[in-house]
């Protein structure tokens, strides 16, 4: 049975929150293999640093220490795109949603993901891309919020790195929620999707037809 985790974090320095860590420990205790799928497939050095860390960032695999003891770690980008992505855990990294989505579709990883029955981690843009409808909230680079067609493994559309104190982000989510339901997920929270079951870990905000429901 496929389990999908929709996360905002961890970031390059800060790790998982206690609530998310405790949840992951329950489901990753037997996991031995993990495959990371890049959002910057052309930049292998950046991807290596993002996964394994350097003197400036912790690295995703190091954030997972204490949660799981992986024996095999794979990184899939343009240099390693012929690797078999099937593993106990597949991790869609954060970053640029467009380059990751194109890379996944061009290499038909989306078809593999649809038939995959392991644990799927989706962080930030990875969590946006895995949905039927991804959502991009306007920022300094994008003038208008928009939806786009994602991979379609879940109907849960998230707004990652959500801050309820950010009035612009909140008002955009309210406005856009008349088209599709949006879940605001702070960095300390996540959503777990397993078949038709949805579980909120930490504080999550649901936007639906302009209304807001807080789950805690």
What kind of feature is each model-predicted range?
Residues 93, 113-133:
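Catalytic nucleophile loop
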Residues 31, 68, 86-88, 116-117, ...:
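Short, well-ordered alpha-helix to beta-strand connector turns
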Residues 6, 35, 89-93, 121-122, ...:
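Structural motif
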Residues 14, 44, 100-101, 130-131:
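Glycine/Thr-rich phosphate-binding loops of Rossmann-like dinucleotide-binding domains
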Residues 2-30, 36-51, 136-216:
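C-terminal and late-domain segments of enzyme folds
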Residues 41-97:
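A glycine-rich, hydrophobic loop/mini-helix early in the fold
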Residues 23, 106-118:
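Catalytic-core regions built around general acid/base machinery
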Residues 97-106:
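Glycine/threonine-rich flexible loop motifs
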